[in-house]
Amino acid sequence: MLTDVEGRAAVKLARKTIESFLSEEKLPEPQELGFELSPVFGEKRGVFVTLTESGLLRGCIGHPFPDSRLEDAIMDSAISAATRDPRFPPVREDELNKIVVEVTILTQPEKINAPAEELPERIEVGKHGLIVKQGYCQGLLLPQVAPEYNMDSIEFLGHTCLKAGLLPDAWLKGAEVSCFEGQIFKEKEPCGEVLEENFSCE
């Protein structure tokens, strides 16, 4: 778990990375950050960076698995969310003052070992994110997606299957389902105060 200070640093790192990349096409130097990164940023963690504008998704890309140092994963995900999400045109530099930056730190995904019909009761909406995999198809939805769109666990499973390019009932027909948890830090407004979000009790 990250502390509030570390969570604020994660979001600031993501924003600073996007600003630096869009203005100068380079990563920010440590001395340019204006804050210190604690040792947790050297640990391997999964992470996603989400960008929204006026409440609408503007980009979301990340590392589902802990394959990189957290600092590197945040910077890579931030650039990718801003410039490489195929669903959206690249973010422009003049848009940044309208965009809210959100960083989700992920736990290691774990396969849910249960009969398909029992999967919905194993999923806690607001706490768990999902990965559905079948063959070469794979889709991921973050923990905050289900409560934000008022999904129950069955709907959440179906939408994760759709994200993977599968039929919504693929989870009932042999697709592998894994879950993970996420610690979410988000700007209250563009460039504003960073708060930790918690959906699990809502």
From Swiss-Prot:
Coiled coil: none annotated. NCBIfam families: AmmeMemoSam_A, PRK00801.1, TIGR00296 family protein. Residues 5-196 form the AMMECR1 domain. SUPFAM superfamilies: AMMECR1-like (SSF143447). InterPro entries: AMMECR1 (IPR023473), AMMECR1_dom_sf (IPR036071), AMMECR1_domain (IPR002733), AMMECR1_N (IPR027485), AmmeMemoSam_A (IPR027623), Uncharacterised_MJ0810 (IPR023472). Disulfide bonds: none annotated. This is Protein Mbar_A1807. It comes from the Archaea.
